[in-house]
């Protein structure tokens, strides 16, 4: 059995930094017990200039879960329920931030979003 991973484009709210775009990339499927690695590429704004940069996911049935964020300073905060399995890092030279979720199971089947 595989864990289904869906990626979607998530953009800023209209009228507020409307040229900022966030684009997720990574695998569509990950096998149970493997690690999920996703990339969020930000255009139109430097991730070191401000804000916190988040990962969230939406489960089948539309339940949302906040996973964690990396602050523009580089500090991170994680959902306590995921803390033992999650890491969020960044590459400031590429204006990207990353999600790694270890030891995935079928319960991690969701659509994954990055957001500001």
Curated annotation (Swiss-Prot):
Residues 49-53 are annotated as: Complementarity-determining-1. Residues 68-84 are annotated as: Complementarity-determining-2. This is Ig heavy chain V region 1B43. GO terms for cellular component: extracellular region; immunoglobulin complex. Keywords: Adaptive immunity, Disulfide bond, Immunity, Immunoglobulin, Signal. Residues 19-48 are annotated as: Framework-1. GO terms for biological process: immunoglobulin mediated immune response. Residues 85-116 are annotated as: Framework-3. This sequence belongs to the VH3660 subfamily. The keyword Signal applies. Residues 1-18 form the signal peptide. Disulfide bonds join 40-114. It comes from Mus musculus (Mouse). InterPro entries: Ig-like_dom, Ig-like_dom_sf, Ig-like_fold, Ig_V-set, IgHV. The keyword Cytoplasm does not apply. It comes from the Eukaryota. One of its GO terms (molecular function) is antigen binding. Residues 54-67 are annotated as: Framework-2.
């Amino acid at each position: 059995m595989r864990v289904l991973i869906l990626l979607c484009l998530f953009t800023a709210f209209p009228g507020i930094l409307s040229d900022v775009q966030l684009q997720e990339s990574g695998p569509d499927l990950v096998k149970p017990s493997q690690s999920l690695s996703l990339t969020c590429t930000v255009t139109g704004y430097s991730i070191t200039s401000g804000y916190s940069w988040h990962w969230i996911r939406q489960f089948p049935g539309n339940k949302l879960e906040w996973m964690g964020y990396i602050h523009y300073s580089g500090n991170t905060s994680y959902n306590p329920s995921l803390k033992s399995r999650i890491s969020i890092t960044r590459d400031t030279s590429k204006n990207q931030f990353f999600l790694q979720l270890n030891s995935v199971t079928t319960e991690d089947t969701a659509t994954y979003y990055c957001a500001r």
